[in-house]
Structures are given as structure tokens and as C-alpha cells.
Amino acid sequence: MLTKTGTSELVAIAGGSASDDANHISGPSRTGDGLYFAMRDAMSEAGVGPADVDMLQMHGTATAYNDEMESKAAGLAGLSDVPAQSLKPYFGHTMGASGIIETILAAEELKRGIFLGVKGFEELGVPVPLNVSAENRLITNPHHCLKTASGFGGTNAAVLLSFGTPAPASAKKTSSALNPVRRVQISQGQVNVDETSAFVSSQTDFHTFSREAFKSREEANMKFYKMDDLCKLGYLASAWLLDGIEYGEEECGIVMSGKYGCLDTDIRHQQIIDSEGDSSASPAVFVYTLPNVVAAEISIRHHIKGENIWFWSEDKTMSDIKKYASILAASRDLKYCIAAHIDFINGDYFAIFELLENTDR
């Protein structure tokens, strides 16, 4: 059982964080720094140091680049000697469900003091050593397990689970005052920046509008044309939003929302499978069947490695996600946070992006 307030009988989610590699839409960072940031911040939020971690449960896809990245992140976090595992050899990669399934099992491992061996493991194939074993291990009186996950868009997440000891009370501020710096709205072939027209297309249909808007920016990023329409919309809005804005790679976060998410691309992906069979499924389309990939494309373009998150919401005023943005700004000491509502479905498109500055910093 998981709870936000640890007791002697329950496993607590004592800390958590997310980050982005800002590197590649489908390939992991080669340095491991993005995942390390999430691991570091999850431990910090829980008031736990590397020496206090008893178990390390990694994403562990058994692919060369991912495992290399994870080993480097664990090394940067000071966790190379902590017993480490991946549970995917037992039940495969359950895609979006893998994080929650494996977190539940991590909680059970903490309670039982049994750390499962990595099924099929024979030898390390990573550049930074990890404490991996094929055998189950008994761990006496374990208190803390760090669980990580990574996904498309270079998204990383980490949670620090605690058992048998209450999470320490945080002395950090719970929210920050945020001041609006700039607002961008896109709809009907037009880009408005702070109520002033910044670009008007000759056509309102999205394909014509997006091409003309992108060309007007005079950018040389040809990867724009490979993106799905939702990501193109977010990419364009962020381009005008962040013009001339300076920040460190960890000083900006992204909080996004929408009603439809990636549904338009989900439908297109399924139509390919229905008409041509499973073997014709396009990796170039599949990678965009997650709404967080919008934030990933923005992060790659603008070198943002701070925390990002997606919420399902119909609130175009963004009153709900702005509250979360203020919490995020305080907990991660952000200089800026992007709050955005974005939707694309059946050719209809709408985006509002606001850049919020942390005035308590």
C-alpha cells in the first residue's frame, strides 16, 4: 500500500521528480545527466542521501543505449554500489503501465526485505558498474528504494519510496509567486503575442499555417517537418514565447494541459495498423502517441531539462495548472515556468502559452 505519509506499516512516496534529456525524441541521453537530475531531486525532496538508499530499481530495457545512460545516471547520483535491478525480464515492457506496476512491486520488496534478482542476467554490459545480480537478495530492515523510469522524448522520472520511517517534514516553500512575462495564443491561422498580432497566415488550415509560420521564423530545424501536428503547434507557440529569454537548462519547467492530448495521432497510428497490419505500424508515428512528447520537442529545441508534466484539462484559463506551476517553481527553484493549454483534433487547433517568472527567487 502506498501513502503520502509514511508509517511503520505503509510505504510512503517520500519524494519524486521528473526531467527531460533535451536530447532526442526517441534516443536516450549519452551522458545520463537528465535522469540523474530526477534521481537527485527525488532524494533531496525526501531528505535522503545516496548512503541511505537500500534498493535501486531502474527502467532497465536491456537496450545498449538505455542501459549505458542509466548506469551513468546512477554513478552521478552516487548509487553505483546500491543493489540494482530491472523487473522487465519477468513480464516484459508494459509500456505506459511499466512505471506503476514496477513501483507497486518495489513497495512490496521494501516491505518484505526481498530484492528480486534480474532474470537472465549474466554479466554487466554498461560502462559504469552497477550492483546487479541474477539471484534474489535478502536486505535486512530496508527503508528506502529509488525507482526510476524513462520514456519517449527523453522524459525521466524518479520516486523515492520509504518504509518504516516517516518522511521528514520539508522546510522548503510550498509555492512561489509567479508573474506573467509573456502570453502567446495560436488559432485560426494567427499568432498573437500579448494581444498583438505577430504572424498571420494566408490560410487557416493547419498544414498551410504551420509551414508558413515556421518559415517566417527562418529556423533551419528540418526536424520540424517530421513532427506530428500537436508538436508542431507547441513548437511554434514556444518559439514566440521564449524569444530573447535566458535561463539555465534546469531553471525552466513546463506544465501542459489539453482536452484531447495526442488523440489525433493515436487515431492515425491505429488507422495504419487497421489498414496495413501490425507489421506496417510506423515508428515515426508511434513515437508521438504520448502527449508529453510536445514538451519534449520544446525541451529539445530550447535546451530545457527542468521538470515537465501533462494534465488532462478543458480549462483554457489554466487556473488549475498555474497552481501546480507555482508549486513546481518553489520545489525546483525555477526561474521560469511555462504554463500551456494546447489541443489539436481533426484539423482544429488552439494553443495558449504563458511564460511565468518566479518572483520569489
Predicted regions and their residues:
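Short, structured beta-strand segments at or near domain termini in extracellular proteins/domains
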Residues: 1-4, 160
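Conserved "HGTGT" condensation-loop signature of ketosynthase/thiolase-family condensing enzymes
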Residues: 8-361
